């Protein structure tokens, strides 16, 4: 029988529910259990694909092309599994599905209501996640905060699941906050007590409470919370601020959280062997070298917009005993006059993905600087497109070269719409999304990175390199080192006369793992370290 664990949050958002869920998933996986994990987001958007990164942070793309919440990135990195479209569910998706069924007449003329129709649809998404992956344990994180109007149908659905399949098969974990008041010099449990009271009023009694805190939680305080919240004192788990996210699973294990879960769910698996994970955390805490990478983007004020990129850089650094420091450079501020001042003190330059024209010219200036000064460069998605445009402008002399996305009237559309995108009107869910093959050219940096003739990477784009300019650019030293298997679509480009200048149309950051860095990121960071040492 599949077991179900539900993770809710209270008091404030951004408490780290996702990290808690991912860490528990890692512990259960290391006990030999097949774990899958999903995130329920209460917003009415069908997915975050058209949402601003300022609103939502990064959009994480799965193998099967779902545009999802950034928490799925944490899940994949911690548990080391590839998730699918069933791993992220929104209110918009639920209502869309129910309304389509109503139009097809599947409700036999009945009145369609939140209970049972919406809640049944939510429950079906929970159970489907288990069925599709043949999971022993399904962990479901409920986005938002208990008390939000938007979350109510989800909370009612997960309440019903305990009645449907029995208490031994369901567990509720509530993440909350114990604030520290500096003026009073005290930590306060009252917000947590009220949050649990709110949750219990909805019919859900948490089995474990995970408390986020800046300061250590005393045993007296745990006993007090246990008394008022009606749980075992051992089930009050402290989630103190950690020096690295990857230390969280070890902290939870030290407090026997995974054993409490297994005892409740009647799982008799052996304790998790976290030897390799401990070695990883020790390595992360004792890196002996440093390198500095300039990340030139337009959402740099909100670092969550590039969270997978930053994690992929860190993972690559771990391989070389190196702490990768990211210098955040706002692309809108970069000019030919100040580019050296802004990126000259870094060892490598990275231009990540994005949409729209804001900050584009600054990114192109940064790319030109990397090309002319032999600085290691990695371009991702839009970064690859702009690297192509920069080369066309400044090496081929094609003045005004651009992308038709940025300037529809450009005389040289180096980047243009994919043919199948010409007549697409809807923005949501219509990009080239998900896993596609890429054929690599031998004796290139890309091939050396992967050491494979064909690789599969995740994509999220609408525009593509225009093959009309391919031969001319190739003749000038622009290498097309990765293409679709039929050779039609350009996937990776690099420079002939440069130590390491590689740009990819796909998003390599999405598949990086802390113990298995993505090959392009690994070689980019290695080239940056070499560049630093040669100065």
Curated annotation (Swiss-Prot):
Active site: 381, 507, 509
Protein residues bound to ATP: 14-19, 71
Chain sites annotated for binding UTP: 13, 188-193, 224
Enzyme Commission number: 6.3.4.2
Tree of life domain: Bacteria
Catalytic activity line of the entry: UTP + L-glutamine + ATP + H2O = CTP + L-glutamate + ADP + phosphate + 2 H(+); L-glutamine + H2O = L-glutamate + NH4(+); UTP + NH4(+) + ATP = CTP + ADP + phosphate + 2 H(+)
Claim: ATP-binding is one of the keywords in the record: yes
GO biological process: 'de novo' CTP biosynthetic process; pyrimidine nucleobase biosynthetic process
Keywords: ATP-binding, Glutamine amidotransferase, Ligase, Magnesium, Metal-binding, Nucleotide-binding, Pyrimidine biosynthesis
Residue ranges occupied by any Glutamine amidotransferase type-1 domain in the UniProt entry: 292-534
Means of activity regulation: Allosterically activated by GTP, when glutamine is the substrate; GTP has no effect on the reaction when ammonia is the substrate. The allosteric effector GTP functions by stabilizing the protein conformation that binds the tetrahedral intermediate(s) formed during glutamine hydrolysis. Inhibited by the product CTP, via allosteric rather than competitive inhibition.
Binding site for CTP: 13, 148-150, 188-193, 224
Function in brief: Catalyzes the ATP-dependent amination of UTP to CTP with either L-glutamine or ammonia as the source of nitrogen. Regulates intracellular CTP levels through interactions with the four ribonucleotide triphosphates.
The protein's name in its UniProt record: CTP synthase
Organism in which the protein naturally occurs: Bacillus cytotoxicus (strain DSM 22905 / CIP 110041 / 391-98 / NVH 391-98)
Name of encoding gene: pyrG
């Amino acid at each position: 029988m599949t077991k179900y664990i539900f993770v809710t949050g209270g008091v404030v958002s951004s408490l780290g529910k996702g990290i808690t869920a991912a860490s528990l998933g890692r512990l259960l996986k290391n006990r030999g259990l097949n774990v899958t994990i999903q995130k329920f987001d209460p917003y009415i958007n069908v997915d975050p694909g058209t949402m601003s990164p300022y609103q939502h942070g990064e959009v994480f793309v799965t193998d099967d092309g779902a545009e999802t919440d950034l928490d799925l990135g944490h899940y994949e990195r911690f548990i080391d599994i590839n998730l699918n479209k069933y791993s992220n569910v929104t209110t918009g998706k639920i209502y869309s599905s129910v309304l389509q069924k109503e139009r097809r007449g599947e409700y036999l003329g009945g009145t369609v209501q939140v209970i049972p129709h919406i809640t049944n649809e939510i429950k079906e998404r929970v159970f489907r996640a288990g069925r599709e992956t043949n999971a022993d344990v399904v962990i479901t994180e409920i986005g938002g905060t208990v008390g939000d109007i938007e979350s109510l149908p989800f909370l009612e659905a997960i309440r019903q699941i305990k009645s449907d399949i029995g208490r031994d098969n369901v567990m509720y974990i509530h993440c909350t906050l114990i604030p520290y008041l500096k003026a009073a010099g005290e930590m306060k449990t009252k917000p947590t007590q009220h949050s649990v009271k709110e949750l219990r009023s909805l019919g859900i009694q948490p089995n474990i409470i995970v408390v986020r805190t800046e300061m250590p939680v005393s045993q007296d305080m745990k006993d007090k919370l246990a008394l008022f919240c009606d749980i075992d004192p051992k089930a009050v788990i402290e989630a103190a601020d950690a020096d690295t996210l990857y230390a969280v699973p070890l902290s939870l294990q030290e407090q026997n959280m995974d054993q409490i879960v297994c005892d409740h769910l009647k799982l008799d698996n052996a304790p998790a062997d976290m030897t390799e994970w401990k070695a990883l955390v020790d390595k992360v805490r004792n890196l002996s070298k440093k390198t500095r990478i300039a990340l030139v983007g337009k959402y740099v004020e909100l670092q969550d917009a590039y969270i997978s990129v930053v994690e992929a850089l860190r993972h690559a650094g771990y391989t070389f005993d190196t702490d990768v420091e990211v210098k955040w450079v706002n692309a809108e501020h970069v000019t030919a006059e100040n580019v050296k001042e802004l990126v000259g003190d870094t060892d490598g330059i990275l231009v990540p993905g994005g949409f729209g024209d804001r900050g584009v010219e600054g990114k192109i200036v940064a790319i030109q600087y990397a090309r002319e000064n032999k600085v290691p460069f990695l371009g991702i998605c839009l970064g690859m497109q702009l690297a192509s445009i920069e080369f066309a402008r400044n090496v081929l002399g094609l003045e005004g070269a651009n992308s038709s996305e940025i300037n529809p009237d450009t005389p040289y559309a180096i980047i243009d719409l994919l043919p199948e995108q010409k007549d697409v009107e809807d923005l949501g869910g219509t990009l080239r999304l998900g896993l596609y093959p890429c054929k690599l050219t031998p004796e290139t940096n890309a091939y050396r990175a992967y050491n494979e003739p064909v690789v599969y990477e995740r994509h999220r784009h609408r525009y593509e390199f225009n093959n009309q300019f391919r031969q001319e650019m190739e003749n000038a030293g622009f290498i097309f080192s990765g293409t679709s298997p039929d050779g039609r679509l350009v996937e990776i480009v690099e420079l002939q006369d440069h130590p390491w200048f590689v740009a990819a149309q796909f998003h390599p950051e999405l598949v990086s793992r802390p113990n298995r860095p993505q090959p392009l990121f690994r070689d980019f960071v290695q080239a940056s370290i070499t560049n630093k040492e040669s100065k």
